[in-house]
Amino acid sequence: MFLFKINKDFDFLKKTFLKFFQQKHIINRLNDIERLNISGWEIWLQVEMLIFLCAQDNVQEAYREERCFMDQRKEKLKSLCAIDFIVREKGAHSFIPIEVKQNMEAAACIRNMIKDFDKYNNIRQLELPSERDLWLIGIHRKVEQDYLFKLIDEKLDINHKYVFTQEIK
């Protein structure tokens, strides 16, 4: 049952975000960001994602910046954090937590994604908006898939079948 839910969530998120990144206005804007070397566009992207998610027929609910209390036994410096998105697919009983990171460089993007993974593991269990696993979405310049797997494998033990890459152009 556990793997079934992971596979179902992966398929749902992959289809949904593939559709998001195929929108012409998103492609054009991301190409402009690349061309002009603009940084700090993560919030813009998250707002676009939320608008998109809320318009999807297969999404029951989607929220951005879901606040959670940190487990003070694990995290001494901060008492509160936010999960970028929680999304509930139609027919599902619980939300899927999602963290989004952007960086032009793949290595920095992966490092920041791992920090979000660690942050999520420091949230008080009672505060988690879901019993489902956290999913990470990273947006960075294109790199070879072997290099991407090397970056991931240095820090996480993750099945590569749950890593999806899509060039945006």
Describe the predicted segments one by one.
Residues 2, 153-169:
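Non-catalytic C-terminal interaction segments of nucleic acid-processing enzymes
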Residues 30-38, 69-74, 101-108:
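Surface-exposed cleft-lining segments at the edges of enzyme active sites
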Residues 54-58, 125:
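A general structural signal for alpha-helical elements within enzymatic catalytic domains
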Residues 84-106, 120:
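Conserved catalytic cores of phosphodiester-cleaving nucleases, focusing on short active-site segments
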Residues 1-55:
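Interdomain/boundary linker segments immediately adjacent to catalytic/signaling cores
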Residues 38, 43, 60-92:
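Active-site metal-binding core of divalent-cation-utilizing nuclease and nuclease-like domains
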Residues 103-127:
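Mg2+/Mn2+-dependent nuclease catalytic core
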Residues 124-152:
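Nucleic-acid nuclease catalytic cores
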